[in-house]
Amino acid sequence: MQQRIKDILHQGQVGDRITVKGWVRTKRELKECTFVNLNDGSTLAGLQVVIPNTVAAATPTMKDLTTGAAAEFTGELVRSPGKNQAIELHAEEIHLWGTADPETYPLQKKRHSFEFLRTIAHLRPRTNTLGAVMRVRNACATAIHQFFQERGFLWVHTPIITASDCEGAGELFTVTTLDLTQPPKTPEGKIDFSQDFFGRRAYLTVSGQLEAEIMATAFTNVYTFGPTFRAENSNTSRHLAEFWMVEPEMAFCDLRGDMELAEAFLQFVFRYVLDHCPEDMAFFQERIDHSVMATAEQMATQPFAHLSYSEAIQVLEKSGRAFEFPVAWGLDLQSEHERYLAEEYCQRPVIVYDYPAAIKAFYMRLNDDGKTVAAMDILAPKIGEIIGGSQREERFDVLQERIVTQGLDPAPYWWYLDLRRYGSVPHAGFGLGFERLVQFMTGMDNIRDVIPFPRTPGNAEF
């Protein structure tokens, strides 16, 4: 296996003879030698390769060694006289794998706007910013699995194609093989999905939660981590049509246990990234948002504040702020309300709990007051809601009534109700939008810049 530049920079010794492969970021030709900055994606920093004129003269492809070209260098590591890194490679042999015409290659040595980079999404991973984003994204995913695996959770794979709408919002992508120009019709004139591939209407999943509840009733503690889909026609910096969700589900757990786990989970992930991606986080601190390190440190170390929804409404009403959206008991909190609570009132992450039943999903447990449900949201400075969760309704009759009162057809949820017929227990869970986490971690303004291939209204390249 070839040596990666990250390992060479951290473990390479003066005098080592190595071969390294990567892509040319920059090339500078001087009187006695040529300097090439080579990057292979393993680290933000590139390896400086020094090519003596004698070696350059013996390399016919030297003129094609331009920004974007893929190349292989063999030589000896020597102490670098420069300040930026301790060692550099003095090349003795050069092999050019692939050229990049400088007249047409769009990534040159200058800053490109993120808007421009979205138009060349197949090349933007080669930039410093997107490279750093992807390494932080990888570290977040690694931390998520480590957190749950260390606590005995079972990773379960919930279906991408589903027959149920977890959120009841109706923002679903339909999956069909019917001829849309001449679909079969029912006697009432509606599309007859009984003749479709699955014999019924099917959708891309909006959440793995309901299926995770099935698994939690057998394995106690489980989690899902996979793609979800929302057909929400929102062209904003916070919305994607395809995104990843982390959704743990715990049997024999109430809302308090759910909140405690969610707080510990976020603290673990932020600490892991700070410890494992210091160079990338320093890059975001310098280039993107001067407060990302302090924010991440706060998330990793400070205990979260707690407010009931009713208390939060009182705080907002007494704030003296002229919010764009109205504040009243029974209305959902908007992003401006969430950010005020986290950034100004609590000045740290805050968990808001016990929301009005009317504004929350049917599966959330009805509290004894009959007006609120055992739901919680974790609100973070600068971004607002980062986690949403609840204790689930384990009582058959109450759940059945909630489905009906929210205007849903009980028929597709027969199996969900069955879980309450046989060995029902209190259980709880939460959901984390993975891209929202990465966006918060890195300070990136637009969520489309923290996922490799963003899916948004009017855009599904590749």
From Swiss-Prot:
One of its GO terms (cellular component) is cytoplasm. It is an enzyme of class 6 (ligase). Gene3D superfamilies: Bira Bifunctional Protein, Domain 2, Nucleic acid-binding proteins. InterPro entries: Aa-tRNA-synt_II, aa-tRNA-synth_II, aa-tRNA-synth_II/BPL/LPL, Asn-tRNA-ligase, Asp/Asn-tRNA-synth_IIb, NA-bd_OB-fold, NA-bd_OB_tRNA. The keyword Methyltransferase does not apply. GO terms for biological process: asparaginyl-tRNA aminoacylation. It is found in: Cytoplasm. It catalyses: tRNA(Asn) + L-asparagine + ATP = L-asparaginyl-tRNA(Asn) + AMP + diphosphate + H(+). Belongs to the class-II aminoacyl-tRNA synthetase family. Homodimer. This is Asparagine--tRNA ligase.
